[in-house]
Amino acid sequence: MFMGEFRHSLDSKGRVIVPAKFRKGLGDNFVATRGLDNCIFVYPMNEWKVLEEKIRQLPLTKSDARAFSRFFLSGASECELDKQGRISLPSNLRDYAALQKDVVIIGVSNRVEIWSQEKWDNYQQQAESSFENIAEEIVDFDI
């Protein structure tokens, strides 16, 4: 399970250090793709295969299903860590997520997300103001 928030910098070659805490969970090969909210989703290969199968089951006759499949899968790239624990992010993903220099890498259960620091800070500020309302509407932890 991935959790936590880490701030790093993108180097001039489009590489970013993956937090040591996430490296083992991602494994040797993993997949990065366009995520929701203009961030990059990074999945360990086993999680990617589960997600890919679910996408494959979407009805081909539905235009929204085709659009989602195209968006999600066409942006996907198989990645690996270099010896320094960095991931080289393809330019199409860096452009999509508006990654410049400062990035935030967060753990979200079965995936890692990579955000531009500016977008993450804005998102977090908005989310904090509505967190309690969202929790009341969708979450029932029976606590």
From Swiss-Prot:
NCBIfam families: division/cell wall cluster transcriptional repressor MraZ. One of its GO terms (cellular component) is nucleoid. Gene3D superfamilies: Transcriptional regulator MraZ domain (3.40.1550.20). Its main location: cytoplasm. Forms oligomers. GO terms for molecular function: DNA-binding transcription factor activity; transcription cis-regulatory region binding. Residues 5-47, 76-119 form the SpoVT-AbrB domain. The keyword Transcription applies. It comes from the Bacteria. It is found in: Cytoplasm, Nucleoid. Belongs to the MraZ family. Keywords: Cytoplasm, DNA-binding, Repeat, Transcription, Transcription regulation. HAMAP family: MraZ. Signal peptide: none annotated. One of its GO terms (biological process) is negative regulation of DNA-templated transcription initiation. This is Transcriptional regulator MraZ. The gene is mraZ.
